[in-house]
Amino acid sequence: MDAPGYLCTGTSDVLDLEAQVALIKAMQPEVKSIGILYTSSEDNSITNLKNFKAICDKEGIEVVATAVQGAADIPAAAEELASKVDCINNFTDNNVVNNLSVVLNAADKYKIPVYGSEEEQVVNGCLASVSIDYVALGKVTGEMAVSVLKGEDASAMPVKTITEATPVINSTEIGRA
């Protein structure tokens, strides 16, 4: 992504999945299974799931993945998933995040934590996340936009990725780990 091509560039919020798995293991040292609820039509979720499974395989952790098509599928899928795993981990799946309260309610029923993929999910009830700074990402994006507006060739600008991530913990949910 050093030179994406015709008038194309941007920024990326790639998840640090290795750090996320390390966080889950630190908070739940005995974790044996992690549930993933994802939307089958979101390419980002499919890619994250593949990478997450590879990391968990190395750690001896089973990933139980449940695909949904839309919001109407989430209540039953979240309930079923929560009944089978030690915790649930969210990606930046738009459909799932927009229905986070449903996932949290299912997890509450089985007294398991939900880990988020960014700080806002933790604010909304997830136990913890290794989160990138979306304000910093926005600033980098804005700086790139200014460069394009000043005449720089967007197609020659590499895509920039924010890689610094910070653990964020919801102290009111800490007992759930």
Where in the sequence are the language-model features?
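Hydrophobic alpha-helical segments within soluble ligand-binding/sensing domains
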Residues: D2-S33, I132-E152
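Venus flytrap/periplasmic-binding-protein-like
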Residues: M1, V103-L127
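An alpha-beta-alpha
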Residues: G10-C56, P158-E173
